[in-house]
Amino acid sequence: MIVRALVLGLSLELLPPSSTPFANTSNCFDFVALTPMQAMKSLSELHRAKKIILGGAPISAPMEALLQEIPTEIYATYGMTETVSHIALRPIAPKERHSMVYTTIGESRVWQDEQGCLVIHCPEVAEGEIHTHDVVRLHGAHAFEWLGRLDNIINSAGVKIYPEGVERKLSSFISDRFFIWKEPDALLGERVILLVEGREADYPHLLENLQKETVFSKYELPKKIYFLPHFQLTASDKIQREATAKLLL
């Protein structure tokens, strides 16, 4: 934010790190950068910002629905270490502008490699091409829809399943941490499974409730649910999918 303020000629207000940053100030702002958690804990205060960018963690479907009701311009960001800052934005709010498509900013251009992964040309910050492991659906040279990580794809009966997309659909049904993974299947090759950090007793009818939903394809629907007391996490509190799945062995 310091660099952004210097480039754009903005005045900064310095606040202590907090999950509820608006609680430490009574001011209104032109531009604010938040994590999804900070946004969720500040829903009643987001109207104090004209524009908000969100990054650093996934945005669940229920969270996105709540954010669409805020009278503020809110954008999801796409970027990585190699691009220094975000290179694309996706509008979340107001509701009439909501889209699942990211649009590049500046001189950035995008295309796909042979595996369907995003390749970025961002001359302002990097020389040459930046190859990612993010599988996307292109909408021209300056727009794309993010589908998931190449490393996580599940091949079930020849159908490619993107766990991140399934997780987005599941986020309305599960209040604890969870993720989609795979296990070998004699008929399908790989089948979708669901891992939940919590107690089975708290979700007595979860599988049968999911089977009644029409938002899942027959291959996306988890074939089995596993409950674990604790997931393996990184130092930044992100789920280590493969390490956690190994706990089932």
Regions found by a protein language model. Name each.
Residues 1-41:
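AMP-binding/adenylate-forming
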Residues 30-31, 50, 134:
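Conserved acidic residues
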Residues 31-33, 53, 195:
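Structural motif
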Residues 46-95:
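Gly/Ser/Thr-rich phosphate-binding loop
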Residues 75-82, 101-103, 181-184:
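Beta-strand->loop->alpha-helix junctions that form or flank phosphate-binding loops
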Residues 109-137, 142:
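AMP-binding/adenylate-forming core of the ANL superfamily
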Residues 133-220:
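AMP-binding/adenylate-forming catalytic core of the ANL superfamily
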Residues 193-197, 212-249:
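Conserved C-terminal "lid"/linker of ANL adenylate-forming enzymes
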